[in-house]
């Protein structure tokens, strides 16, 4: 158990550990940072940084309007960090595989969520987060509080993995009606 930092390292309940340097891993731009750092450009030269200037907009945390065929695993709007991550990754990969098989079977080349489906998804995340204790935290990386200038919105889907899986399965069963498919 950590007790304190010393001149040469860290003191725990049972030991003293000496280090040349201690690097505190704080300030990561969770969930959105890795995608924003790619400088992605979608349809009509839409830059992701501009599209997400007020909040990340995804549908199911799997795709972004105006960015056809861009699939995301563990993206903003997915349960991601609020679930068992390997199980969630597996679910995402299976959903994406099924979606690609659907496109191939139907001779379609592109898919992207509608702006309306992404807005409804963001509204659902906000509704669930507002009804939880998550929003009571004064400072939380879940809301982007650790990054100056980052929009302050709840980022992961807080409805639980079983509910999320059911929603994804329903979207698949309804043949991706919430998407623009060409």
Predicted regions and their residues:
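Conserved small/polar residues in nucleotide/adenosyl-binding loops
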Residues: 1-5
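Residue-level detector of beta-strand face positions
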Residues: 9-11, 39
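Short hydrophobic core segments
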Residues: 10, 17-29
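Detector for glycine-centered tight turns/loop "hinges" at secondary-structure junctions
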Residues: 14-15, 44-47, 107
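Structural alpha-helical scaffold elements that stabilize or flank donor/cofactor-binding regions
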Residues: 15-16, 63
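FAD-dinucleotide binding site
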Residues: 17, 46, 54-57, 115-119
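Glycine-rich loop(s) and the adjacent beta-strand/alpha-helix scaffold that form part
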Residues: 29-78
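C-terminal, flexible cofactor-proximal segment of oxidoreductases
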Residues: 58, 69-182
């Amino acid at each position: 158990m950590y007790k304190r930092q010393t001149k040469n390292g860290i003191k725990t309940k049972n030991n003293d550990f000496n280090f040349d340097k201690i690097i505190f891993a704080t300030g990561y731009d969770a969930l959105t940072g890795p995608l924003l750092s790619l400088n992605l450009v979608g349809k009509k030269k839409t830059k992701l940084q501009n599209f997400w200037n007020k909040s990340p907009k995804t549908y199911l945390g799997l795709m972004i309007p105006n960015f056809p065929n861009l699939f995301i695993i563990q993206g903003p709007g997915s349960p991601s960090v609020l679930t068992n991550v390997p199980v969630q990754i597996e679910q995402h990969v299976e959903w994406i595989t099924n979606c690609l098989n659907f496109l191939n079977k139907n001779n379609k080349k592109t898919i992207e969520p509608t702006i309306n489906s992404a807005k409804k998804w963001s509204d659902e995340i906000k509704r669930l987060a507002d009804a939880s204790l998550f929003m009571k935290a004064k400072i939380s990386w879940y809301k982007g509080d650790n990054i100056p200038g980052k929009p302050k919105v709840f980022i992961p889907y807080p409805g639980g993995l079983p509910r999320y899986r059911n929603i994804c399965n329903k979207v698949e069963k309804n043949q991706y009606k919430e998407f623009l498919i060409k």
